[in-house]
């Protein structure tokens, strides 16, 4: 009988604190041994040669929309999780909206879990929704195991997940705090965005720059300021999604100093693309909050390098191809398909271009998401006793992303055509070999 189910030989292990060469052995989905390279016998189990490769903990993507049930023509657990595996992600948190019906009751949560259990290639958790009228369902959703709750402070683009006015937010946050849970927030001012959008359309200002100006940074700041005050009032932990500007980070940093229990994420598209690229790529790069000026991108990197951002998520938000076409930027679907490319962006733009330490990339993509949501040290690190979920990476392999490389149901993405350096070669999830580069 073999001692181990799988051995990763002679790779450079990267954790949140250090790097070192080792053999890593897996048994029953758990890291069973970490030893000097070459010290485990070839008779002890099947092996992957990690020579020249780096072994990262599996990424934890806390923000994806896989649209199942009800909108599997947009994505789905099978294609979405395969894309994640190809990008080095071994755990994802699926958002409650863009499936139909949304995950705002225990019944819908149970249906979604059954589908994911049947189809998902990697591990998962689910967000429950906070919407007007469902506060009485929060307890049942929590008992059903949601990782937290999600609310929108502005309209989300579909009619089946309503945004939350102040009363819903305050009542919901009080309940969520009592449950010991957390609220994730899409923070843009609904009234400001609607007013500026109406004015832009009336004046026939319909370029991508006009779209960005209709959702200005100040709309994020106004909403973030409000939700931080509500967090103080209710003692509710909050997680602010997809921040696009360092101006917002500075206010969140101040709130942390005041004792507010708040974390913040940004997304790879805000770290790679600016308004200039938005104009070149077109509607595929529409998202909310929108892409910003190049200086805002660089400032966001400064904040990231300085530790002002807790974690990186993809906010993978796919749609039918025809939803990305239309007469004006204001009419098309706002969402970017990108969950397969988060690590590639961070290695290319972070490690290679800006000399971000690999340990910091692990913190942002694996460790801090796991810690914030109570999954560490089972996930988010590589150590004996931890879950055997990791990805083997060739840091120096360069490639141009082609649509044929993507595993999404619809291989359309603003990342297509981008040049990346650093490629996932293998992904292991709970001891199972779920992806191998060809």
Curated annotation (Swiss-Prot):
Enzyme class: hydrolase
Binding site for Zn(2+) 2: 150, 186, 242
Transmembrane segments: none
Modified residues (N6-carboxylysine): 150
Requisite cofactors: Zn(2+)
Zinc-finger listed as a keyword: no
Functional description taken from the UniProt entry: Catalyzes the conversion of allantoin (5-ureidohydantoin) to allantoic acid by hydrolytic cleavage of the five-member hydantoin ring.
Family under the similarity heading: Belongs to the metallo-dependent hydrolases superfamily. Allantoinase family.
Protein name, as recorded: Allantoinase
Source organism of this protein record: Halalkalibacterium halodurans (strain ATCC BAA-125 / DSM 18197 / FERM 7344 / JCM 9153 / C-125) (Bacillus halodurans)
